[in-house]
Amino acid sequence: MYKRQKEYSVYGINDFVICAGYKQYMIKEWFNNYFLNTSDVTFDMTDGNKVILHEQHSEPWRVTVVDTGENTMTGGRIKRIQKYIGNETFCMTYGDGVCDVDISEIIKFHRSHGKLATLTSVLLDQSKGVLNIGGDNAVQSFREKSKEDSAPINAGYMVLEPEIFDYLDGDECIFEQAPLEKLAEEGQLMSYRHRGFWQCMDTMREKIQLENLWSHGKAPWKVW
């Protein structure tokens, strides 16, 4: 989560809304204790238990952590944060993948076509949503992937207009199914094609691989 925010912050995006669920209180505690945990601290018990933080490190962030429920589906979670988004265009991403995509280029592409939604596509053989993309980068169809497929997949970096909230209904709504399928059918879903590094972290093997890249200073997604 912290690394995802560092990534977006490079491109000037510093206002975050986190769709929290399971153990959401731990996320809130982490931010609440951020300065305490990232600074040298003096506990002066001779002066009324005074706490002095030394060389405080801060980020230029505004973070809203929203309890969207433990069992809420992806579309339902996005719907629950609508009041914090308002009428602004916003970026949306997941926390289970890493990528070296230039987020400013995704936003630039999104603004160029005037549609409601832009997702980032990559060419990998993974069990993600399959895209049928036309020559004009319009997503002609969207569906969940089967093992027989080998096609562009949804990399999870999106730019969305506030009108997409009209496509979401209730906690059982799965964003990657009916909403994206309908947006594609209506010609309102576009694809930004990324041909650089992307990797999800769905298995222990993938976790070990990515941690190894990070620990050896070879993480392509570390753009900060």
What is each residue range found by the language model?
Residues 89-91, 98, 102-111, 123-126, ...:
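Catalytic-core segments of class I nucleotidyltransferases/pyrophosphorylases
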Residues 46, 66-68, 120, 192-194, ...:
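Conserved beta-strand termini and adjacent loop/short-helix elements that scaffold enzyme active sites
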Residues 3-94, 105, 203:
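Conserved N-terminal catalytic core of the sugar/cofactor nucleotidyltransferase
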Residues 27, 81, 96, 110, ...:
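Residue-level signal for inorganic ion chemistry
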Residues 14-16, 116-117, 188:
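Residues at the starts of beta-strands that form the adenosine-phosphate
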Residues 72-73, 130-142:
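Acidic/His-rich active-site region of diverse nucleotide-sugar glycosyltransferases
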Residues 20, 121-122:
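Short beta-strand/turn micro-motifs composed of small residues
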